Amino acid sequence: MANTTSPRFTTTQWLIIIIASIGFLFDTYELLMTPLVAAPAIAELLNVPLNNSLVTDWVGRLLWIAALCGGVFGLCGGWLVDRFGRKRVMAASIFMYSLSPFCAAYATTLPTFIFFRSATFIGVCVEFVAAITWLAEVFPDKKQRERWLGITQAFASLGGVAVTVVSIWISSHGKDLPHMGLPLSLGATDPGSWRYLLMTGILPAIPIALLLPFVPESQVWKDRRAAGSLKRPSFAAIFAPELRRVTVVTAILSACAYGIAFGALQVTVARVTPGLPELKDQAKTLVPLRKEADALNK
């Protein structure tokens, strides 16, 4: 009777699983940070109220500029991982999307803020390509490969939960945090909470820097590079007569799905009702009047 058990993992495979899981988790963490910081950051950098039309206009511009940059460089991800290696590109992309939000936290102009947020999107999109490629090559067993590609990508869903929890905590405790040289808005005594949230984007760089020295480059990539077989297939091949219909339909459906998901994730309560903070302050001033009215009605 044939042995159908899957081969046991090596230390290298476990390390790559951990690195990929961290990468996917913080992919979503970094992306979903945008709807939380975009409006307050733009309002502060332009020195206008949150409900000013300029804020809405620039939030929209930020989203499409960052998404366009990420998409273009994501398309180049395949070439990059073939040219420079899976490990090197994945490390560079994770460090890029870790350091860029930290730099954005110190932005004092809108162009600088948009530049670093676009750099974050580029890092996320390239990291996704590198991680998928690296994982696929690490597991020669088909069942293990499919299982762990799914499991590691599932960590992306935790990124949204993590950034929400961190954002809530910073909103409650931001005034107690050290300033760390962060810029202040006009008339403010404490940095905006959005700056602290952006600073947390550097977190994935710490475990990656500690783990990567112990992980070798993909052996599959090294063997193919030595054999000179890394030449990528022609882009036109996927539009061959027998594949054209599948390619076009799949591309359209994928574009719609990603477009809807990306757009929906940017709609937060702060964007739907940008005047809530002002209404809260107005409600506080009405408390004494309500008490007087209640006393008169007794």
Predicted features by range, described:
Residues M1-K298:
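Transmembrane-helix signature of 12-pass secondary carriers
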